[in-house]
UniProtKB/Swiss-Prot annotation:
It comes from the Archaea. GO terms for molecular function: homocitrate synthase activity. InterPro entries: AIPM/Hcit_synth_CS (IPR002034), Aldolase_TIM (IPR013785), LEU1_arch (IPR011830), LeuA/HCS_post-cat (IPR054691), PYR_CT (IPR000891). Residues 19-270 form the Pyruvate carboxyltransferase domain. SUPFAM superfamilies: Aldolase (SSF51569). One of its GO terms (biological process) is biosynthetic process. PROSITE patterns: AIPM_HOMOCIT_SYNTH_1, AIPM_HOMOCIT_SYNTH_2, PYR_CT. Pathway: Organic acid metabolism; 2-oxosuberate biosynthesis. This is Homocitrate synthase AksA.
């Protein structure tokens, strides 16, 4: 059930009919310190992204290594529905590496802020413009779809950024990216930024946001509110430093809050999240939105009673919609209805005396910070029944 205020706000927005998700788990996600996917793992993740319905998959950075090229090439040859892209610096050699992988397109980038020009590239603005023109034209001449990203664009003076984007457009780029490389934007600023870009180029705009201030998803959605038509994501929000905009959060927010749904098979999200967590070695926080272990778990007696009556009272998303399950957790906040529901699951008649005694023991364990698992509950119920002279095993009913 959507908030009436969200409905009212969205009605007043000039939203795009469709938003393209170009997922970079296999490239930017793999740049998470300590993460390295095998080619087989990359292929499996790519298949799950494709099953989800992601329109574009950024499969890697081919110039990095021969192993990376092999992995990108395998994904490109897999016959997926998604367009397969890869990253390329504004260098012909990087484009050649992409061509060698048979990808559909490239995301080519160069830094544009004075900070990067002075301390990293040691290049003039004119040299940057020349590199953009040469690389975009070269990639287009060789039949590639091309997106251009101005690295650290959100810290670049717009006077120069306008020239950057116009150069990319004039040389044939298919899309330009508003890139918040170090996550310094706020939603209001991102809306302003995208609006300014729309004034100077007649191309679709994508957005690539990092999460250094925890704003990647909010900034990505703000960009869509301002007319951006593509969002860069990673599964579980993994990526350099604090990570990127989380795929699962972006997709569900677009669908449930903005009414933008190109037909994603969202039931795949939980499996995809678990697989990326397993292969990356990065645990999903239990309170992670959409796919965290606690996202659909309830302990408070008041909440459990309401959820059992009408799930929407405390669940803005149906857990099955994202491949998750609702879980009633027992602890010191547990109420009678949760115990009744659990007893019924075990096939035990929820008589008043049994419910009260089980509830008392659960709360006592909760006060001692003992987690009441399903097996622990069965033990409690068994002891309560035995104390009443009933020897049946509740777990076998």
């Amino acid at each position: 059930m959507q908030s009436p205020y969200v409905r009212e706000a969205v009605r007043e927005m000039d939203l795009p009919d469709e938003v393209i998700v170009y997922d970079t788990t296999l490239r930017d996600g793999e740049q998470t310190p300590g993460v390295s996917f095998t080619p087989e793992q990359k292929l499996e993740i790519a298949h799950l992204l494709d099953e989800l319905g992601v329109q574009q998959i950024e499969a890697g950075f081919p110039v990095v290594s021969e192993g990376e090229r092999d992995a990108v090439r395998r994904i490109a040859h897999e016959g997926l529905n998604a367009d397969i892209l890869c990253l390329a610096r504004t260098l012909r050699g990087d484009v050649d590496a992409a061509l060698d992988c048979d990808v559909d397109g490239v995301i080519t980038f160069i830094a544009t802020s004075e900070l990067h020009l002075k301390h990293k590239l040691r290049m003039s603005r004119e040299e940057v413009l020349e590199r953009i023109a040469d690389t975009v034209e070269y990639a287009k001449d060789h039949g590639l779809w091309v997106a251009f990203s101005a690295e650290d664009g959100t810290r670049t003076e717009f006077e120069f950024l306008e020239r950057v984007y116009r150069t990319a457009e004039e040389c044939g780029a298919d899309r330009v990216h508003a890139t918040d490389t170090v996550g310094v934007m706020i939603p209001a600023a991102m809306r302003l930024f995208v609006a300014k870009i729309r004034e100077v180029v007649d191309l679709p705009i994508g957005v690539h946001c990092h999460d250094d201030f925890g704003m990647a998803v909010a900034n990505s959605l703000a960009a869509v509110e301002a007319g951006a038509q593509a969002i860069s994501t990673t599964v579980n929000g993994i990526g350099e430093r604090a990570g990127n905009a989380a795929l699962e959060e972006v997709i569900m927010a677009l669908k449930e809050l903005y009414g933008i749904d190109p037909g994603f098979n969202t039931e795949v999200l939980a499996e995809l999240s678990r697989k990326v967590s397993e292969y990356s070695g990065i645990d999903v926080p239990p309170n992670k939105a959409v796919v965290g272990e606690n996202a659909f778990r309830h302990e408070s007696g008041i909440h459990v009673a309401a959820v059992l009556e009408e799930p929407r009272t405390y669940e803005p998303i149906d857990p099955k919609e994202v491949g998750m399950n609702r879980k009633i957790v027992l602890g010191k906040h547990t109420g009678r209805k949760a115990v009744v529901a659990k007893l019924e699951e075990l096939g035990v008649e929820p008589e008043e005396e049994i419910v009260e005694e089980v509830l008392k023991r659960i709360k006592a364990l909760g006060d001692r910070r003992v987690r009441v698992t399903d097996s622990k509950l069965e033990e409690i119920v068994r002891n309560v029944l035995e104390s009443r002279g009933d020897r049946d095993d509740p777990g076998s009913r």
